[in-house]
Amino acid sequence: MLNGIGFIIILVCVFGSFIMSGGKSEIIAHALPHEMMAIAGAAIGAFIVANSMATIKKAGTGIMRAFKGGKWKAQDYKDLLTLMFTVLSTFKKGGATALEPHLDQPEESNLFTPYPRLLKDHHLVEFICDYLRMMTVNFEDPHQIEAAMDADIEKHHHEEAGPQHALQIMADGLPALGIVAAVLGVIKTMGSIDQPTEILGAMIGGALVGTFLGVLLSYCVVGPLAAKLLETLEADGKPYSIVKTAIVAYAQNQ
């Protein structure tokens, strides 16, 4: 919702100021289809060349995540803290024997089932269970557990950030692609140099639409979406840090 409002403000302010200053919108409207085809087509083609199929597929999901924002709510963080307290309390009271059945089948465990939203994130649940198991067999070395968890979190973040990095590269390249489209427009104009001034002016104006579109798409569309996706990924990664902090703190205090 907030993203949509932002895009509306961009369009109203950019094109509204142009029209209010006496600009001829028909020049932009006439040049827009073929300039957009050149810029968007080149950007999408370069995106396909530069990225794996997995990253390309995740990019669409990533854009949707940028619009939706982080998936975790305040209650989810409270539930996660409660879950970690319950799990670690069970381990403290009953040891590894009491905890292992819950780790083997968390979807059937009475410790996990009260929190269905957490259970839906299979990677988070696996992360919790794997390192609790590691703690039960290597309880005397909390630093090793911490190092392993840091490496796992970093690996997960790197995998999740692939589409965001690809979108940011696309955003960085769009102004240059706008120049490419503008140069093509100038070449077309030079082929009609014998035309009247009015026609040449309209053709040059249409060519400049390419530069305009490249910069607009970069800094007002793709770039902001990439930044919002990065913010979303960082927010969605916080539960892993919470789990790591809880497990390491428990291990170090024993």
Please place each PLM-identified region on the residue numbering:
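Helix-termination/interfacial motifs at the ends of transmembrane alpha-helices
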Residues: 5-8, 12-27, 145-148, 152-230
